[in-house]
Amino acid sequence: AGGSSDTDSFMKELKELAKGDDRILFTGFVQGAMLDELYSNAYIYTLPSDLEGMPLSLLEAMSYGNACLVSDIPECTEVVEDKAIIFRKSNIKDLTEKLQDACDDIRKVGKLKEQAADFICAKYNWDEVVDKTLALYGEKSR
């Protein structure tokens, strides 16, 4: 789900490759109930980014209890720690292998799903983030 930063010709090629496979959806930008539905029913959330800020969609996906497959950029690995499948950025072969492994290993994906929501909600609990920020400001003002 979401827009594309890729070229129109690449998206056209992807859609052509996926034609006839009703498991693959190109939704474009979605929000609200439709986004909730997609997160709630995903088998695995994949974030193949080469560059990110704080990946809010990754936090959302994990909060819905999704197993995640992310590139090894620091912005992703610092979020997921050891609670996701990680592949080498820009390495299509590694991404393909890890995605295939996830499709083949239902138990592993199930374990990641079980851990995801509790882990991410504890790590990014708003009250704790505020407390840590205030403590940091307190240290710096001394």
Model-derived regions: residue spans:
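Conserved acidic donor-binding segment of nucleotide-sugar-dependent glycosyltransferases
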Residues: 85-93, 101-107
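Aromatic "clamp/platform" in nucleotide-sugar-dependent glycosyltransferases that forms part
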Residues: 50
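Short alpha-helical donor nucleotide-sugar binding micro-motif in glycosyltransferases
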Residues: 29-30, 37-42
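A short hydrophobic beta-strand element within the catalytic core of glycosyltransferases
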Residues: 45-46
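A short, well-ordered alpha-helix in the C-terminal region of glycosyltransferases
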Residues: 108-122, 132
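Glycosyltransferase donor-sugar binding loop
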Residues: 1-12, 25-29
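Short hydrophobic beta-strand element within catalytic cores of glycosyltransferases
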Residues: 67-70
